[in-house]
């Protein structure tokens, strides 16, 4: 049903007809408020295919951001829409956005071990010895106190790999490969938990 209290002093239509029975059921895709689709209630969750060149920060001084891709009404929501984890400016792929702080915590906390799958191309040939090293949970990154959590590495070709992480440290994928002498040239997040990008 369309709730009158949701839209006080607004012109609500369903398939172009003004609504006078706010108890009637309607397909959300057919509802318009003052001629525009209604804003979603609290609990917004968006799956975005982030392009290269955008940052995941609300601070516009850091450059063009992913929030510029959203309709204006979602950019001004309260609570604010924010990314669940971040992808750096040079990384593309699956990015989740939400206005639910509890969901952000649940999906980014290392204790929940939510898998994130990345595809990387690197500057040098990848040794099969990296597979057990990344899986061991002993890989120590520079300036980090604790070693990386075990990570699944699948070598697709000499310079391409798929890496599954259950934690999200700063530039972790790039730093893991760099620690072994391989610079990441392209990086794409293909999956977050059970969600993945289609073709």
Residue ranges and their predicted role:
Residues 1-199:
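Basic, flexible Lys/Arg- and Gly-enriched helix-loop patches that mediate nucleic-acid binding at interfaces
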């Amino acid at each position: 049903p369309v709730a009158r209290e949701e839209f006080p002093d607004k012109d609500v239509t369903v398939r172009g007809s003004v609504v006078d029975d706010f108890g009637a059921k309607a397909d959300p895709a057919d509802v318009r408020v003052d001629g525009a689709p209604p804003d979603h209630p609290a609990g917004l969750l968006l799956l975005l295919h982030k392009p290269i060149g955008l940052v995941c920060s609300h601070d516009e001084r850091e450059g063009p951001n992913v929030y510029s891709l959203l309709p204006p009404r979602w950019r001004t929501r309260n609570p604010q829409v924010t990314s669940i984890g971040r992808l750096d400016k040079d990384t593309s792929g699956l990015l989740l956005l939400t206005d639910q702080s509890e969901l952000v915590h649940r999906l980014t906390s290392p204790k929940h071990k939510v898998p994130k799958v990345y595809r990387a191309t690197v500057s040098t040939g990848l040794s099969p010895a990296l597979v057990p090293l990344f899986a061991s949970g002993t890989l120590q990154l520079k300036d980090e106190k604790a070693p990386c959590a075990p990570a699944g590495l699948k070598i697709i070709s000499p310079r391409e790999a798929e890496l599954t992480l259950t934690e999200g440290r700063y530039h972790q994928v790039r730093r893991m490969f760099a620690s072994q002498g391989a610079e990441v040239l392209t990086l794409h997040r293909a999956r977050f938990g059970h969600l993945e990008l289609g073709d």
